[in-house]
Amino acid sequence: MPLNLPDKLPAIELLKEENIFVIDTSRATQQDIRPLRIVILNLMPLKITTETDLVRLLSNTPLQVEISFMKIKSHTSKNTPIEHMQTFYTDFEQMRNEKYDGMIITGAPVEQMDFEEVTYWEEITEIFDWARTHVTSTLYICWAAQAGLYHHYGVPKYPLDQKMFGIFEHRVLEPFHSIFRGFDDCFYVPHSRHTEVRREDILKVPELTLLSESKDAGVYMAMARGGREFFVTGHSEYSPYTLDTEYRRDLGKGLPIEIPRNYYVDDDPDKGPLVRWRAHANLLFSNWLNYFVYQETPYNINDIE
């Protein structure tokens, strides 16, 4: 089914080249159904890349989906053209009276800072609280998952001795949970982070359910409020060459970086990546949209509370 994207968003042409079905707003207005309203708070530096990664996965949906992009006022993006931000992004203050069927909050390159030291911490925690009464289900990814767990439930994060970098095997702890419908017993997820949350801290919080973990990468997914909040520590949305780009970037800067684990064919960067996470990434996002957004959201969006 199609995604309804803002007219002229760069991701439209990129995804059409991949045979992904998208339509722009002009065409969507001719279809007489209520689309699911999804807002994305994109905190990643390379915003166009992240937009494309997420939109690619959101395209596999049962209904028309209308995508909006939110930005925070207390931070200015240095890696995305200002014209792009002005055209496609809206400040939270201008969106606070809106309601949405679903929300995705991305990671951010601030994980090695204490949460309270992040310049936009006050604003983003206000958004976390706002989402609880204005969004049917919120998907927190990577740093946002750590930040949401800390803000809502007091779960701390811990520095890692070595960056968690590569593709790791995970297991499903709740096999009959709807978020895992169609999943294999084990599945693969990209990780790229310097910090972690720990299972013992998750298990101490009665409101949290630990859904998936990895013997190497640790906690992968936790849920709260009956599926109104999901906290995902990995990057299922990553495209095939994202880790390769990060690896070569850090090599070029002379930073200490290991080859991403379980990623390249024969662990040889010259042979390219072996993609093992794409199918489960699509299942994750389609299951979230279907079972926790579409099936749960009221027809009258103003009834969300």
From Swiss-Prot:
Pathway: Amino-acid biosynthesis; L-methionine biosynthesis via de novo pathway; O-acetyl-L-homoserine from L-homoserine: step 1/1. Its EC number is 2.3.1.31. This is Homoserine O-acetyltransferase. Belongs to the MetA family. It comes from Bacteroides thetaiotaomicron (strain ATCC 29148 / DSM 2079 / JCM 5827 / CCUG 10774 / NCTC 10582 / VPI-5482 / E50). It is an enzyme of class 2 (transferase). The record marks 192 as: Important for substrate specificity. The lineage of its organism: Bacteria, Pseudomonadati, Bacteroidota, Bacteroidia, Bacteroidales. PANTHER family: HOMOSERINE O-SUCCINYLTRANSFERASE. InterPro entries: Class_I_gatase-like, HST_MetA, MetA_family. One of its GO terms (molecular function) is homoserine O-succinyltransferase activity. It is found in: Cytoplasm. SUPFAM superfamilies: Class I glutamine amidotransferase-like.
